[in-house]
């Protein structure tokens, strides 16, 4: 017997009742007219693929899910509280069945199912808001005089909906495959024992002042250009763009060289655009806590602090990240050490020529992509004394 089921063991149906709790799910009244704008209801039905049919209680009961669990799922997905209005469809029932079924089958714990609902709801809510705003942005004037915004929106959604739905599923599958591949590769790679991510913040300088000076459209274009540039630089690498916050982006990678390269390329790309303000980047190395696609912890806080104290158009890194670059041969411990390595290589070549051997037989000259310059030590609230390093790109090999 499902939650709210009022039938007895005799199989007789209960008497009709005005209470929604007494309405069996197979006797849903389809004659009740919604009080909302009929055209808006048509648009909603187009998007949802079905007409309004169930109250929340009826949907939960039809799905065989307790009202308490259904409510928690809906709250997690950030659905509006509609009371017991008849506003849900067959798709809502099916979604409840599927999510609850994963819990019953032991594939997900109940807290994990709630988390899945919340992360999916938050991600798609932002995507939906962005898409509808973008599609309707240019429709300030109706195609024909007297047309309402709903009348303008309906044919546009009718054309776009099936294509966008297929595209969304395609992109999600590609991203899922990429994320799964990274996890599997990390588990199989014996050398990658330490999976502490390198976390980077990139922050536009003087963004608050810009918000007062620029028009809304100009500000939007600037933010979009910044986010697009960051995403384009991160996408081809093994790094991941965690989130964008207007004037700030957060991305993470497991390889120190990749992290440093992205940071410097971002500085270089932004400095070539005269319309963009200066950029500051902070990188920290350490463990992080991941939750619903976001990252938290001391490493993230340190990267953020380094960004706030970095010079304009510069990259500051913490000591742990600097050691990683040195350990992997991406940067010398110091410029003096790099000069000694070059001098030693030159001496090996000289001795080889003196002995009649080919210099190519000698060990190659050290190749350093990056240079590190120690900066001033300073106390950072909650993190103690921090000694940042200024990251820069070195010139030609061995220089």
UniProtKB/Swiss-Prot annotation:
Its EC number is 4.6.1.1. Its cofactor is Mg(2+). This is Adenylate cyclase. The gene is cya. InterPro entries: A/G_cyclase (IPR001054), Adenylyl/Guanylyl_Cyclase_3/4 (IPR050697), Nucleotide_cyclase (IPR029787). The keyword Nucleotide-binding applies. Belongs to the adenylyl cyclase class-3 family. It is an enzyme of class 4 (lyase). SUPFAM superfamilies: Nucleotide cyclase.
């Amino acid at each position: 017997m499902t939650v709210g089921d009022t039938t007895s063991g005799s199989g007789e149906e209960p008497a009709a009742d005005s209470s929604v709790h007494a309405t069996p799910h197979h006797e849903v009244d389809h004659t009740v007219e919604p009080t909302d704008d009929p055209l808006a209801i048509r648009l909603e039905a187009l998007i949802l693929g079905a007409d309004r049919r169930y109250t929340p209680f009826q949907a939960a009961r039809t799905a065989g899910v307790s009202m308490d669990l259904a409510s928690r799922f809906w709250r997690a997905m950030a659905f509006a509280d509609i009371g017991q209005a008849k506003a849900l469809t067959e798709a809502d029932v099916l979604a409840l069945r599927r999510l609850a079924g994963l819990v019953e089958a032991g594939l997900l714990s109940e807290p994990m199912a709630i988390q899945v609902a919340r992360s999916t709801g938050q991600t798609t809510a932002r995507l939906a808001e962005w898409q509808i705003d973008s599609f309707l942005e240019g429709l300030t004037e109706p195609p024909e005089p007297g047309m309402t915004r709903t009348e303008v929106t309906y044919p546009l959604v009718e054309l776009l909906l099936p294509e966008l739905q297929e595209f969304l599923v395609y992109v999600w599958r590609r991203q899922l495959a990429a994320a799964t591949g990274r996890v599997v590769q990390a588990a199989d790679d014996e050398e990658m024992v330490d999976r502490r991510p390198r976390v980077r913040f990139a922050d536009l300088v003087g963004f608050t002042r810009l918000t007062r000076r620029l028009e809304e459209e100009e500000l939007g274009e600037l933010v979009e250009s910044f986010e697009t540039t960051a995403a384009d630089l991160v996408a081809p690498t093994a790094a991941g763009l965690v989130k964008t916050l207007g004037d700030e982006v957060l991305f993470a990678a497991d390889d120190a060289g990749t992290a440093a390269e992205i940071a410097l390329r971002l500085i270089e790309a932004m400095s070539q655009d005269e319309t963009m303000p200066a950029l500051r980047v902070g990188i920290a190395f350490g463990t992080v806590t991941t939750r619903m696609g976001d990252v938290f912890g001391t490493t993230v806080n340190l990267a953020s602090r380094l960004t706030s104290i970095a010079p304009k158009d510069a990259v500051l890194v913490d000591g742990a990240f600097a050691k990683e670059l040195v350990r992997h041969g991406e940067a010398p411990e110091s410029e003096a050490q790099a000069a000694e390595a070059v001098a030693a290589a030159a001496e090996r070549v000289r001795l080889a020529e003196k002995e009649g051997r080919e210099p190519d037989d000698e060990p190659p000259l050290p190749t350093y992509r990056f240079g590190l310059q120690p900066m001033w030590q300073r106390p950072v609230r909650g993190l103690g004394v921090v000694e940042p390093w200024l990251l820069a790109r070195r010139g030609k090999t061995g220089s």
